[in-house]
């Protein structure tokens, strides 16, 4: 009789499958990147996933986010993702936290976890998560700027200090220096030069990002999410 993980076990072995079943991964940001990371880990035998995001599924998510369908509009992203994972991996424990990640979120690290995926697009929260993970000794992989790009083949995994062509990475490097954070930060990033989106979409917006939202395809965010999941997966199966 076929089992859900039998093809995976052929590749990694029974001992690795057992390690995956005992692992817990925190994913912050269930978006174009984080949604695909959660999907991949849910299908790869991870025993426990903690999903954090305060947003609801919106029409503008339909072109790229795995959780976005006409049936899920206006629903919590974390709850939609959790239901999706339970539909194909009922043994995976999925905990949902419908809130923005900030400095008050450190209680999350009061429980055992094996890895963190940072799929946050707000710089201050991104650095807060990176610092918290480092402080608690939990490895973290961060996704950098994936908007305004077309080519998923230009993604790579290095550390933050080796990035280029990425305005978000540049701003994060500056914040890291100001905070005196010296640890190497593993990141998934794109070598592709980003497209400049200068079309006013929401004149009533309060911020530049609201007025000029980033352009996005499915290709790059999805590939970034799968890359983050792959980094985590490989670390977990090798950790025994």
Q: What are the residue ranges of the model-derived segments?
A:
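Glycine-rich phosphate-binding loop and adjoining beta1-alpha1-beta2 segment
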Residues: 46, 51-88
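Hydrophobic/small residue at the entry helix of a nucleotide-binding pocket
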Residues: 33-34
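Conserved N-terminal Rossmann-fold NAD(P)-binding element of oxidoreductases
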Residues: 27-29, 52
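Glycine-rich phosphate/adenylate-binding loop
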Residues: 109-112, 125-128, 135, 140, ...
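Acidic/polar active-site rim loop that often engages polyanionic ligands
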Residues: 59-67, 148-159
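N-terminal charged helix/coil linker that caps or initiates catalytic domains
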Residues: 1-26
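Conserved SAM/SAH-binding loop
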Residues: 97-105
């Amino acid at each position: 009789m076929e089992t859900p993980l039998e093809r995976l076990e052929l590749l990694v072995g029974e001992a690795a499958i057992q390690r995956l079943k005992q692992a817990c991964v925190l994913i912050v940001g269930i978006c174009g990147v984080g949604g695909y990371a959660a999907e991949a880990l849910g299908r790869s035998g991870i025993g426990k996933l903690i999903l954090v995001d305060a947003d609801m599924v919106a029409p503008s998510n339909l072109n790229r986010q795995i959780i976005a369908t006409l049936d899920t509009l206006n629903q919590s992203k974390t709850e939609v993702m959790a239901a999706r994972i339970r539909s194909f991996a009922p043994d995976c424990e999925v905990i949902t936290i419908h809130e923005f990640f900030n400095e008050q979120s450190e209680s999350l690290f009061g429980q055992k976890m094996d890895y963190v995926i940072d799929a946050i697009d707000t710089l201050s929260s991104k650095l807060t998560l990176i610092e918290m993970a480092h402080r608690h000794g939990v490895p973290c992989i961060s996704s950098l700027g994936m908007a305004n790009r077309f080519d998923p083949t230009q993604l790579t995994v290095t550390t933050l200090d080796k990035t280029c062509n990425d305005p978000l990475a540049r701003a994060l490097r500056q914040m890291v220096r100001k905070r005196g954070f010296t640890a190497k930060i593993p990141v998934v990033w794109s070598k592709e030069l980003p497209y400049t989106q200068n079309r006013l979409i929401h004149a009533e917006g309060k911020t530049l990002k609201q007025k000029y939202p980033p352009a996005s395809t499915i290709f790059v965010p999805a590939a970034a999410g799968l890359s983050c999941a792959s980094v985590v997966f490989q670390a977990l199966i090798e950790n025994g």
